[in-house]
Each structure stands twice: as C-alpha cells, then as structure tokens.
Amino acid sequence: MIGDKSVLDVYLGESQIANITLIDDQLYWSYHESWQQTGYAISPHLPMHEDIPPLNVQRFLRNLLPEGNPLEVLVNVFHLSKYNTFGLIQALGLDTPGSLVILPSNQAIPKHANFRLVTHEELEERLNHRDSYNLIVWDGKPRLSVAGVQDKINVVLNKEGQLGFGEGSLCSTHILKFETQKLSYLVLNEFLSMWLAKCCELNVANVQMKRFGQNPALLVERFDRKLITTNIVKRRHLIDGCQAMNLPPEFKYEQNFGNSRDVAHIRDGVSLPKLFDFANQCINPAKTKQQILDWVLFNVLIFNCDAHGKNISFFVGANGISLAPFYDLVNIKMYPEFEHALAMALGDEFDGYNINAYQLADFADTCRLPRSLVAKHLKYLIGKLTTALQEETQFNLVGNEEDYFKKYQEIVMKRCEHLLKQNDQITSIKL
C-alpha cells in the first residue's frame, strides 16, 4: 500500500501516537485511539480529547525546526520553502528535539542502526575550510535538526568515546557547538557560564570543551537522550518555552516586534510572568518557580541578556510536566557590539545594565513572588558565584583565553558587588 503523501505518522518510542494531516495548507493533529486510552497529551496545546486548532499544530511543529542560517541551508538542501513546515518536518522527522519521530505514512521506523564515525582530523578539516553548508551537510545529509541559530551539529558520543553521526534508529546523544568569527571565544564563554551555573547548583546540561586543531567546540550532553547500548538511545519528550505558551518561534522575545520606538510597547512574546504562571501547570509548582527564579537571577548576574523563550524547556510525560535542565547560558556583555536588551523584562525594565533594587522588586511583584524570596535567592547566588570565581581553576586555557577569562571574572564580580549592595532594599523599596 502506498502511503498518503499528505499524512505524517508521529511516534513516541515504539508507539505510533498521532497523525499530522495537510489539508488545504492547514495542518491537523489527531491522536490515535489507542494512545488516547493509554497515553498523554504531548503538549498542553495539543490536548487529547478536544479539537486542536491547526494554528496550534503549525506553531508546535515550527518550534522543532532550526532557525536563522542553519534553516536556510536546510531549505536549500531539501529544495523547500522555509514556510513549508510540513515538508521540513517530514525531512527532519527522524531526529527532532525530544522523543518524537515523525515519518511519512508509508515509512516504518528504521530497525537498523548505523554509527558513522567522524574523526578529529575530518572535523578539523571541515572547520578550517568551513561555510555553513559543509559544516551542516555531511555525506549529502543534513546533520542538524535541533532548534536555534548557532552553528552546531547533532552527534553521537559512543561508549568508546568516539564522535559520529547516528543513522537509522540511532539518534544523536550530544550537540557539538562552534563559534564564528563574529563571536570569538563564544565556546569558552558558554563553557564558563555553564560551569558557574553548576557552581550555583542550577540544574544545567553537562558540557565539555573540545579542540579540533585550532578550533574550540562545546560538546553538550543532551538531557533528552541517553545512550543505553551501542545501538539504543533512550529518548525523553520535552517542549520549549514557545511551545509551552503556544507561540511561534519568532515570539521567543517578549518584545516580539523588536524594541524600536514604534513597536517597543508590543509585548506579546514569551515573558517572565507567563513562565511563572506556566509553572502552575507543572508537577511541583513551588519548586519549579524557585528553579526559574534562580535561572532569572543567575542570568542577571552574568549578563545573559539573551535568555529567551526557546532557551528554557519542560519535560512532558505520563506523570505531568517538569522543568528541564538549563542550557545556552552566555555572558553577552563580553560582546559590546551586540544588543544588550533583555529578552524578557524584569518588571518593565529591558535595559540589562539598569538592574537595581527597584527593578528586582518590580519583577517580584509582577511575577507574584515574595520579595523576600527574591532577595534570599539573589544573596545566595552571589555568594556561590563569587566563591567560584575566586577559586583556582584548571581549564587548560590557551593563547588569549586566559585574558578573556579574567575579563569575564571582572565583569561578573563587579555585577555581584553592585547587586549585593542593592539586595537589602528589595523588600522595602516602594514602587
């Protein structure tokens, strides 16, 4: 039997759970009856026993796709429009973020698994002579399906410590991220930021710095994947902040039309009040809110201005929704040439440099958090950060990386000193 070219089958693990149907340019999601009896809604906006608006389906799927230049490379490879969500998902469906596998209706889940080894020498050669195409496309196949704009590829780290590409039923376990000429030392920046987050006891993805010749890279362990045996990867379903809010990817910033004068007042994108409100849908709302609070305050302390709606994710399972580890933490102040406006306002403040007791009190009130809780967590994080930054470290830095690290330390220490002075006023200041 030849499958319908306008129907995609959705699998979670070995279970076929739903169909996506394209009718007159609209996408429709329908759960299988067996899954409705035994499963769960994979997103709050793709409910089990209600009609699902096509707009919800379109937004959910678009948030599975890469963004920016990586998306442009993929549409050229597949000869598709970037607006053809159905076609792009069909092309990338074997290795989407989380646990979903999305395939044409006439195509079964692959039973075979193949590991395509990538040697250090091969990757170094690609990086030395790279453009976006030859970094993403290997053996005529795109090796990127995760969302985001940064240069990166999906890889498998096998039991022998070798890097490669998973094919067939073998999906990626790690993401390998690279820096560009525009963002020198970005790999070191993110490594330091993730290390500091761990020092502050935030739940973050595990990362390692790698070098391929003169090219640094960040190897990020996927928290939605775990290699069980040589050919078996256990996957865990998750959604990002945009999917949680039922928003398209371009609404990942609170000021979804930008911050120019005529549109700055439009704030329909993902925001901190929306995230804290969504925490009420999680298994443990109080714990989730405290974890998000620590993420927000840590981002303030290290100048991670670009903490947007696609840089936070939630696990979704039979037992409910829970916060996933944090990722993509970067000190943006190290790059003065880039935008330093906050992705999500603290209260009404988008200026990342103008964060004082007033803004933190406004943030607490706006998100319905006790000011005393915000002050307590801020003081705790400052203590952890300053201790970590003053300790001796063994990071095997090379060239000018040591100077970069010192500058990073100075910026964060100065921020900590300033906000520690402001901290006692958070509970008493009048708005």
Where does each model-flagged region fall?
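Phosphate/dinucleotide-binding and metal-coordinating scaffold of catalytic cores
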Residues: 1-431
